Regions:
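Extended amphipathic ligand-handling, pore-lining, and cofactor/metal-binding catalytic surfaces
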Residues: 1-255, 260-272
Length: 272
């Protein structure tokens, strides 16, 4: 922990709210920081979350699914958010590797073939930093492969869409419609229901990905589906602008859904 973080959690001036609400049982998680990796490693890189239940269900869920799909590879974990790593370790005693620690662990264990699977949504700042770290280690392995983030390549402007974005748009919309109790998106629209998928938002140039997702929804004919962002970048996806768009389209009920890999702080606090 940094000195500032230590002041929050230790001594007479400790902040009792630093760790916030009860977020579940951390013992159900698996930091996947074991040695004895073998020749082949599949490193799953996530931003991370301090919400234990969400970490177990979402991040661990992805890691477990990958391990089941590729039993001949050792799945390991790295988080890119050091503040979350520190938070979880101080509160729960769970030690999660950051990127450098995970890469060092792979080298020390003699890994020959490294595949990196990010759970990031887009080519944003966290993805860029991950790539910078990987590039410094490439000569330590016989082969290194890095997967695209969920939404694929960014593209130059809001009109550029790709198959990855279309697949995600179809999947998240179908799940939202079903869980809302409708047989179809048109049936929801007939009830004046709109679906708003909220992303994190970013000042990175990758922010255009959110606009591209809105373009994708429109291209698919999903007229009552809107893309918003918690932090309001890009401007057209800021909450106030999305609210105005929903009102202008005549919808009277909104169902909010996270456009995030993990339902952590933003989903539980900002959206709620």
């Amino acid at each position: 922990l940094t000195d500032t973080q230590k002041e929050l959690v230790e001594g007479e001036n400790a902040d009792p709210d630093y760790f916030g609400r009860d977020t579940g049982d951390a013992s159900k998680d698996d930091a996947r920081n074991q040695d004895d990796i073998g020749d082949n490693e599949l490193l799953v890189v996530s931003f991370g979350t301090s919400f234990n239940d969400s970490r177990v269900k979402d991040i661990k869920g992805i890691e477990d699914a990958l391990q089941a799909a590729y039993p001949d590879w050792s799945v390991r974990r790295a988080f890119t958010a050091q503040i979350i790593i520190n938070h979880v370790q101080a509160r729960d005693g769970e030690k999660i590797d950051n990127m450098q620690q995970a890469m060092d662990r792979a080298v020390e264990n003699g890994v020959k073939n490294l595949v990196v699977q990010p759970t990031h949504l887009m080519h944003g700042a966290e993805y860029d930093e991950m790539m910078e770290m990987i590039d410094t280690y490439r000569d330590k392995f016989e082969s290194v492969a890095v997967a695209e983030p969920l939404l694929g390549e960014v593209g130059s402007d809001a009109t550029i869409i790709n198959q990855d974005k279309e697949d995600v748009a179809k999947a998240v919309t179908a799940a939202a419609v079903k869980e809302a109790g409708y047989d179809s998106l048109d049936a929801a629209a007939a009830d004046k229901v709109a679906f708003v998928f909220m992303g994190h938002g970013t000042s990175h140039t990758a922010k255009v990905s959110y606009s591209q997702m809105q373009t994708t929804m429109q291209t698919l004919g999903y007229d009552n589906v809107f893309i918003g962002t918690v932090e309001g970048k890009p401007e057209e996806t800021a909450c106030e602008n999305v609210i105005e768009a929903v009102k202008a389209a005549g919808y009277t009920k909104v169902i909010l859904r996270p456009l995030m890999v993990v339902a952590g702080d933003h989903a539980n606090n900002d959206m709620a």
